[in-house]
């Protein structure tokens, strides 16, 4: 009995280390529902707006906010610190307009429990008996009070701290413009500031950058040559610490990206939560005082105020009301004039594409070099727009390097416009299905795209505070950025629900050829229905064709059946896209085809989870040896397609009723079905 208990205990310890080792990156755009992923202590709390408030305007208090799971900073058995990258947005609102303190720090520590630490100049990291810290730690401090004990250079500086509050290197706070001009930056000015910290383990160099904007500066504010291998342990905790002294400030964290496998993405500052700043309250009091004085001023000043009021009223009348979903999404709402100018009046030259949902335009935001994609919802798709807006209020918080980011929106009367990251290389389907594409994707590029999409789907299913089912995974909704990374886009059909709960049944929406058979039978959503669609994408990338090709030979009509027949006959190379000219990694191609068949199985119990798919693609698991049959059927007897469509992959339907064909073994149903009821185009 005791031996069994010991084995179980060892297994649990192993699984815990395995989970922590898989965590390479995370992203928070606001923290409204992030409390399960954070360890907060001291006076730290999550404000109603979704920002972390580390300290209040109370003297001599501390606050900590750490990611709840440890991060592996060294490979197993190797004493070498790995590279890491993080970006985060902070704001410090002082108790008095020009006086506050003490500051905050990004910290990497052996434990998230620092409750024995002191406030004031120790920033909640150390106490007076631990200045020579025996347990190693690393921090980047944003200090707003000069302390002679630690030889601070001034009361507005950034410093790198290693095992001590006396900075190894520090510099006055500031940032660099694109023309290399350095601008001063006041940390405790109540302004949102973004920070980037990048450690390169090969160069053994640490870079710190600041900016009050979304774009990452090219030049570093601090660049320090250091080997962190002797500082960081195998597993450490990452987070933030702040404190107040005789002077106090409210210290806020508005968003946070962390990455152990590449460069952390920059945060879009307009999309972050608002600061519940006491400065605003003081401003209102000052405005009331000014208003009282202005009543005693001359008739001329009064006339100017009246004219200004009329102008504001007219402008407010022209704007649509702000609804609850907009407040939940975040503060950034683009003006209609701004987006009209960005897209050259929504001109045809800027048109990227159109569909049942409306049109998408390329735009360049005024006063910026940033390109965006602007989706203008058509009036014909007005039904369902309110439902879609309620989804946007949640989906707008999603942030992952393999998702197309929603930057903001605009409402003007009945118009609804959504603003996304611009993807300069278009969608994956153009490269796979166009007869004469300008560029033929190499296998290396295809495999990279597949892994990116899988990572994005894993984040949707498991990595956010709610489970997100995309419901329309297909090559046309995989967009490619400037570096040909695959990003999942078009969340117009997505559904969200709490982890562990039952999403229930819903109407069947999606694209013909990508719908899981159990979805079309019962309408019940699961993450496995997304896995089924991803299986089609895997086979599309390997074979260079759509799931259903009505112009193909009868035996090649249904891609899954065709691939399976070649697999059984040992002619699997025959299905590989001929445009690759045989230049591919055969082991990777076979693995992708195996995974495609597994994900496309009619039985959801056979399909892997996206976490398992990612581990296969990252070669953490060997390629599956046994691939069960996907369940055959005679597609000629089981389909009813419009011959003029050219490809069933172009259908975007929702199914009122469907008659299922039973395969040769008469025990399963196929994903290919004929409609016995009517088919309508879903307004998107």
Swiss-Prot record:
**Could you tell me what reaction this enzyme catalyses?**
L-seryl-[protein] + ATP = O-phospho-L-seryl-[protein] + ADP + H(+); L-threonyl-[protein] + ATP = O-phospho-L-threonyl-[protein] + ADP + H(+)
Record's bilayer topology term: Single-pass type I membrane protein
Question: Which residue ranges does the entry give as Extracellular-facing topology?
Answer: 22-292
Q: Which residue ranges does UniProt annotate as crossing the membrane? A: 293-313
Among the GO molecular function terms of this UniProt record, one is: ATP binding
**Catalytic positions?**
472
Broad class of enzyme this protein falls into: transferase
Start and end residues of each Protein kinase domain: 346-621
Q: What is its EC number?
A: 2.7.11.1
- Give the record's GO biological process terms: defense response to bacterium; defense response to oomycetes
Name the domain of life. Answer: Eukaryota
Cytoplasmic side stretches: 314-684
Gene Ontology annotations for the cellular component aspect, listed alphabetically: plasma membrane
Location of this chain's protein in the cell = Cell membrane
Knockout or disruption consequences: Increased susceptibility to the oomycetes Phytophthora brassicae and Phytophthora capsici and to the bacteria Pseudomonas syringae, characterized by stronger necrotic symptoms and higher bacterial proliferation.
Q: Does the keyword Hydrolase apply?
A: no
Q: Family, per the entry?
A: In the C-terminal section; belongs to the protein kinase superfamily. Ser/Thr protein kinase family.
* Protein name as it appears in the record: L-type lectin-domain containing receptor kinase S.4
- Give the organism, scientific name: Arabidopsis thaliana (Mouse-ear cress)
Q: Which gene encodes it?
A: LECRKS4
